[in-house]
């Protein structure tokens, strides 16, 4: 008996250690990698999953005879994974790394379900680790605000371990309700620790200036307080007692909420208008792919195409054209999932989130439910699910919500076999992405030469990594720039044409036009620039390139040249800059010669 308990303890200890490593994913970064802030987290996650899987395989015979009670969220998660695979564009292959990461997330979900069933004490341990990451992030942010630690963005002092304040604030908002629940639920040590975490997060959260995170934090913490201190019975009793004033009370609450949202809108009006435009255009794009979707990674191209069509109609306003951009994300995860996985995928995903929270309420895991709720609200106006940190947190919070006490099962061998297969899958996925680390490390070194304009010396290195990183539009743009600067214009265009299918970045179209102009293919260059103007009609740079194109002796068209030059000289830029002044000076010089 003692030996069995000892073996079980080893198994749970390993699960605790590797689970703690996984919850620490947001804190990891690797400056040696290209995009090391995100990719460092991804590779750390894969490594931690491989270690957890190996530990699971080694100790698979040590577990107690408790079986998982499979539930609706388990099935919905698998169904959503199936929809994602079914709608994916396998020929283009826009997001191979996300597929590997998603596979590991599914393995993590079921391994967590397995361990939490065997050892329910791990539920609070994992929540504690999430709180600890929130505390570390909050202290990190304080250090950045006081100038003791550098941020990861030149324009913002506060980023924590993230690239900008938006996702940083969102992560704190997800952890905050868990901390509040701990402070309200426990006594003595954990009670005080919970309040310390709450206080630390509240110090830095306002400084992040993320309205989405503020709303998520208020909604989730309000719900946690209601669930812990009030509940349905008290709510019904209060309603019965003060029934006559209920309607005026709710009217006042709605009015105050409306005033609060109006204030948040006015805080950064252009940003809010930009997001409203994104949501409108994404909604129109969904109508074009309601069933099949565009597939994972298909958002940027579909969005750019639809925005170009929308701006060609009378419905588009000058204000919308002024605030428009070509985002990588929809800044609303539900709309992005609706576009990429179709309406069916959207229904499955929303049902999965809802079922997790339902099980969490039923199991009285109000802290975990609060964390999921904060993420659900934050995802309505941001992009948390495009970052690994939020997915890892969601898996832990969701597994805590869903997992109930295990039962004695007759088919314990089958369950152990399934657990072993899951662990082997995690190891296989780790092996499948192993070469990616070296590729990103090499890319990081190459970027130093690229940024120093050593295009000729690094062009061959970019070519050698093409097959490994051809799904990254940033890499393709840099590769094409090297080819263009070494006068390999045809090859540069081929690379950029692929990048155009992966990204809505207008610079890709501008680069294609410049390379076609260098080859003397003026008609195609003109077509590319006109398409870019349709997508972003208020940008000055494509008009500048058009004016230079029409000024070419072999393609000179005076009326078109003067129209494009006039746009450069008269259009109001978003921000006055040195680049704008240089473009206008250049156009004036060309006009003087003409």
Question: What are these language model-derived features?
Answer:
Residues 2, 12-28, 46-58, 81-89, ...:
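Alpha-helical transmembrane segments of multi-pass inner-membrane proteins
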Residues 149-155, 296-339:
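Interfacial juxtamembrane loops and adjacent helix segments
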Residues 260-277, 423-453:
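Hydrophobic alpha-helical transmembrane segments in integral membrane proteins
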Residues 443-444, 474-478, 507-514, 541-545, ...:
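Alpha-solenoid helical repeat scaffolds
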Residues 451, 485, 518-519, 552-553:
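Register position in tetratricopeptide repeats
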Residues 467, 500-501, 531-534, 567-570:
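Conserved structural position within tetratricopeptide repeats
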Residues 470-471, 503-504, 537, 573:
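Short coil turns that delineate tetratricopeptide repeat
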């Amino acid at each position: 008996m003692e030996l069995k308990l000892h073996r079980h303890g080893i198994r749970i200890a390993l699960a605790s250690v590797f689970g703690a490593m996984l919850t620490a994913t947001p804190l990891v970064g690797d400056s040696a990698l290209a995009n090391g802030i995100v990719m460092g987290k991804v590779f750390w996650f894969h490594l931690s999953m491989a270690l957890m899987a190996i530990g699971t395989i080694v100790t698979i015979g040590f577990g107690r005879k408790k079986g998982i009670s499979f539930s609706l969220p388990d099935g919905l998660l698998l169904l959503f994974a199936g929809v994602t695979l079914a709608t994916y564009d396998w020929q283009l292959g826009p997001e191979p790394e996300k597929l590997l990461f998603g596979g590991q997330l599914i393995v993590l979900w079921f391994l967590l379900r397995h361990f939490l069933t065997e050892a329910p004490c791990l539920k609070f341990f994992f929540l504690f680790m999430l709180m600890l990451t929130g505390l570390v992030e909050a202290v990190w942010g304080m250090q950045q605000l006081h100038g003791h630690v550098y941020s990861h963005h030149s324009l913002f002092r506060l980023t924590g371990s993230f690239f900008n304040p938006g996702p940083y604030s969102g992560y704190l908002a997800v952890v905050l309700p868990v901390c509040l629940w701990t402070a309200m639920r426990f006594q003595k040590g954990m009670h005080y620790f919970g309040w310390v975490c709450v206080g630390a997060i509240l110090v830095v959260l306002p400084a992040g200036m993320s309205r989405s995170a503020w709303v998520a934090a208020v909604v989730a913490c309000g719900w946690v307080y209601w669930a812990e201190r009030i509940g349905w019975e008290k709510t019904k009793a209060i309603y019965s007692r003060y029934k006559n004033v209920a309607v005026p009370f709710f009217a006042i609450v709605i009015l105050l909420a409306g005033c609060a949202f109006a204030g948040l809108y006015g805080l950064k009006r252009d940003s809010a208008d930009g997001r409203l435009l994104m949501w409108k255009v994404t909604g129109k794009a969904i109508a074009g792919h309601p069933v099949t979707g565009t597939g994972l990674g298909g958002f940027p191209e579909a969005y750019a195409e639809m925005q170009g069509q929308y701006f060609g109609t009378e419905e588009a306003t000058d204000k919308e054209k002024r605030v428009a951009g070509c985002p990588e994300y929809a800044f609303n995860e539900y709309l992005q999932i609706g576009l990429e996985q179709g309406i069916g995928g959207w229904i499955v995903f929303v049902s999965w989130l809802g079922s997790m929270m339902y099980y969490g309420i039923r199991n009285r895991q109000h802290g975990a439910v609060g964390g999921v709720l904060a993420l659900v609200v934050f995802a309505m106006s941001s992009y948390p699910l495009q970052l690994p940190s939020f997915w890892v947190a969601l898996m832990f919070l969701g597994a805590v919500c869903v997992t109930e006490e295990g039962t004695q099962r007759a088919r314990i061998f089958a369950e152990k076999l399934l657990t072993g297969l899951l662990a082997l899958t995690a190891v296989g996925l780790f092996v499948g992405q192993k070469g990616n680390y070296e590729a990103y490390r090499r890319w990081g070194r190459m970027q130093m030469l690229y940024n120093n304009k050593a295009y000729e010396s690094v062009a061959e290195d970019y070519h050698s990594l093409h097959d490994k990183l051809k799904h990254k539009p940033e890499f393709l743009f840099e590769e094409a720039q090297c080819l263009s600067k070494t006068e390999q214009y045809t090859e540069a265009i081929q690379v950029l044409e692929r990048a155009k299918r992966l990204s809505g970045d207008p610079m890709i179209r501008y680069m294609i036009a410049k390379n076609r102009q260098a080859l003397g293919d003026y008609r195609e260059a003109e077509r590319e620039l006109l398409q870019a103007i349709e997508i972003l009609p208020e940008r000055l740079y494509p008009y500048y390139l058009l004016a230079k194109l029409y000024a070419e002796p072999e393609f000179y068209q005076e009326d078109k040249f003067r129209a494009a030059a006039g746009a450069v000289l008269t259009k109001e830029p978003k921000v006055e800059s040195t680049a704008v002044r240089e473009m206008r000076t250049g156009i004036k010089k060309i006009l003087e010669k003409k």
